[in-house]
Amino acid sequence: MRSVWKTLRAIKNGLKEGYRWFLQTFVLRLFVRPDVAVSCAFSAARPSSSEKVVATAMRCAASTYLPSPEGLIANYLLGMDLLGRHGTDSLEWKVYPERAIITPDSAKIPRSTKNYIKRNEFEIVWSRDFEGVLEGCQRQKWSWITPPLMEIYKELFKMGVARSLEAYQEGRLVGGHLGFTVGHTFAGMSSFHAVDRAGTVLWGTLTRKVMDGEIGMVDCGEQKPHFARYGAYVVPREEFVQRVVQGVIRSK
């Protein structure tokens, strides 16, 4: 193991500054298979563009990490999401060319949402009933959360990685955001609500946590008008990966 880290350190020192984020991904976070990190790093050591770095990394990761809790996080650090195909048990890695993110300098809460929050209709807590939120999201029409993926998220929750922001009304779970935390980033993967305004209050609360510094960045996935209301803006995949990795480094 010591020789692996020594090799990685030597490779890192030989790369241009602009590509160091790539190795930081593997050196600091791909804790499952450090030997794979070495082979991926060597194959991308002389890229003609940063886009080739990402492409090479994705080929290495996609061919190495089978669908698993560890593989989900490892590939997420390369801008890849693990999704299920509705109505089947199959899983696939999905790559988006752009990601919508909410950051402290962009976060905003619409006035109507602030008014809903002030009514105190809902109790908002983290991860009181994670499986309840997981099941609520899975019941949504055309949900990509297949049974095998549910098991992976349950394992991520046991590992302390997956979490859910939940809304309760009179003690009953009425809404939730499902996701996981990587460094300073909260990856919002799915959500549901069973009563009016629960989803709105959850979004307002999540955005407030970004504004207050509890969360460094929210990954919204693909941009939607609803996300933009809370300050979400689009960045290229490469910039998104850089931001996630930098958040991991700062969290250490």
PLM feature spans:
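N-acyltransferase acceptor-side catalytic subdomain
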Residues: 1-252
